[in-house]
Design a protein with these regions (language model features):
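Surface-exposed, charged secondary-structure patches
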Residues: 68-138, 247-313
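Positively charged n-region of N-terminal signal peptides that target proteins for export
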Residues: 1-12
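Intrinsically disordered, low-complexity segments enriched in polar/charged residues with Gly/Pro
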Residues: 75-78, 145-149, 254-256, 320-324
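Short beta-strand edge/turn micro-motifs at domain boundaries
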Residues: 119-136, 143-194, 301-311, 322-362
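A broadly structural signal marking compact, well-ordered functional cores
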Residues: 224-362
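C-terminal motif of bacterial Sec signal peptides marking the signal peptidase cleavage site
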Residues: 17-20
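Solvent-exposed, well-ordered amphipathic alpha-helical segments
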Residues: 26, 45-46, 91-99, 159-165, ...
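Core segments of small alpha/beta cavity-forming domains
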Residues: 22-83, 87, 182-258, 265
Length: 362
């Protein structure tokens, strides 16, 4: 009888070790083990948290978060989560299927932690490749998290853990609650690069709309309808002179578009200034002197009727559209901010000066 009793006891103990709350697991131990696995193993549980951050950023900027950057950003978030120390204060039973587990921790402020790193990196941005630039920055930002983390005030958080016959679990809502409480300003490194490249993309899109007849990106930045932007260009930038004979207007506009399309410019990396949306940008320009060349040659000719002038003008425009002339390469520095944009159409504005340098008409 004693042997049977002993066997029964051993069987019960073994069943407890393997059963639902496996190996003597408790709600607080489950949460502790989960936190450790997130810190040390697969960071994929941070994916939903990152996706929410990405969604917010994609609404802010025209440039969209690169899919290929997600793995690097998840690893950065994992390193950030790893920098947070937790004290689990035990579990309280709510009912047969739920437990509350309280944590004490000091949240990591990612923006404060990476501020110096981002400020030092921003002037070194050398390409328009958002993924490449961010990948390099995240390596430096991860080192900052490991070496000099900046924390907020200590706080407490209570999570609700569910219990079933299969053991304990933490649903996605509770998991996001944990991540949101422990890591603040998670997209700060991304902001520091994307806002600069987005400003560069904006100025490039403005010039491309004017000179390349490419309005798609510009329309994204301004929220305007592409067809509306195109219509404005047709009635202003590419409009023929009023006195030009109707039989030549289409050829003139086509030639002018071709001349504009031959314009050469490259927008440099914006240098962030104090204040909201305030940048200094160097634009490398090789002036397209084709229009000037056409006008100069037109003035040297002799004509006996308005029709001859119109024909000569269009033929010269077509000539220099096919064989453009250029001046010496130069650099034009412009301010990009709300003030300069509001004055963009003024004759003495920096934007007007840039346009006149790209395609001199006088």
């Amino acid at each position: 009888m004693k042997k049977k009793h002993l066997c029964l006891v051993l069987t019960l103990i073994f069943a407890l070790l393997l059963g639902g709350c496996a190996s003597g697991e408790t709600a607080d131990k489950y949460v502790g083990d989960l936190i450790t696995s997130i810190k040390k193993e697969d960071p994929s549980s941070l994916s939903s948290f990152l996706e929410q951050g990405i969604s917010d950023e994609n609404e802010t900027y025209v440039l969209q978060f690169p899919d290929e950057l997600k793995d690097s950003y998840l690893k950065f978030l994992q390193a950030s989560f790893n920098a947070v120390e937790f004290e689990i204060n035990g579990a309280k039973k709510i009912d047969d299927e739920r437990y509350s587990v309280q944590h004490t921790f000091t949240p990591l402020d990612i923006e404060a932690t990476t501020k110096n790193t981002c400020e030092k990196y921003s002037p070194a941005i050398s390409s328009t490749d958002l993924n490449a630039e961010m990948t390099k920055l995240l390596e430096k930002a991860t080192e900052a998290v490991k070496s000099s983390p900046s924390y907020e005030n200590s706080t407490q958080l209570t999570l609700e853990v569910k219990k079933s016959k299969d053991g304990y679990s933490l649903d996605d809502e509770q998991l996001q609650k944990l991540f949101s409480a422990t890591m603040d300003n998670i997209m700060a490194p991304y902001d520091s690069v994307c806002e600069i490249l987005d400003a560069q993309d904006y100025l490039t899109s403005c010039l491309n709309a004017l000179f390349k007849n490419d309005v798609a990106e510009y329309a994204k930045h301004t929220g305007e309808d592409e067809s509306s932007v195109q219509s404005q260009l047709e009635s202003s930038m590419y409009a023929p002179p009023e006195e030009l004979s109707a039989s030549y207007t289409e050829r003139y506009s086509a030639a002018l578009k071709a001349i504009c399309n031959n314009c050469q410019y490259s927008v440099g990396t914006p240098k962030k200034q104090d204040g909201l949306f305030n940048y200094i940008i160097d634009v490398t320009v090789t002036p397209n002197t084709s229009f000037q060349s056409a006008m100069n040659e037109l003035e040297t000719g002799t004509y006996y009727s308005e029709e001859e002038v119109d024909r000569a003008l269009v033929e010269l425009m077509e000539k220099y559209a096919a064989a453009p002339t250029y001046g010496a390469q130069t650099t034009v520095t412009v301010s990009l901010n709300f003030k300069t944009l509001s004055a963009a159409g003024a004759e003495d504005s920096e934007i007007t000066s840039l346009i006149d340098t790209i395609l001199p008409v006088e």
